[in-house]
């Protein structure tokens, strides 16, 4: 029988993905003992995905580096934080003095929080005076993010999760939400119970297909052709919302001419 473990509750934000779900850590001594959901007025409504609930184990992984390592004579040697910071300052200062600030680039880890990313870009732009700031996330996930910046001006969604509740039809294209964003999948299923129709476009048998009202299984690599065909049909039938298009988009006529 487990003992009555005394733990400290710490409410926090999950940093695994951009959802930023509210959660609660139960701390036992210096180790994370368990993770619970936070009920109440939070955007995730108490839902947590498996990564948010169980992914905390990486924080106490025995293989995790707890102290800085400096490479000397081809070997990584344990160092103090003061020595590590001084080494970074000396190396970066030497490079900037010799080649200028634009010779330095800062790359962020995909695991960093928004607050850490903000501090890192401040360090780059104010401290080093370079705008060469990037991330390894698109390299690791093989995702191209620039297209969102080009189309929407920001690498963010143009809607909110709560607006799914007001949707009549929800189209999920080439995404496995059970792996990529389980909270979004749970909210889509909840919207379906309120009357929304789910259409999935995916050439793989993802879990959401079992719940969708229509599963379109295109030939791999033809999603763009499918979307162009849908757009062409909407345009030919006059189903587009011209007021919305006029207020929020540019070069729509050019887009229409590009359709097959």
What are the residue ranges of the model-derived segments?
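Catalytic alpha/large subunits of respiratory electron-transfer oxidoreductases
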Residues: 2-260
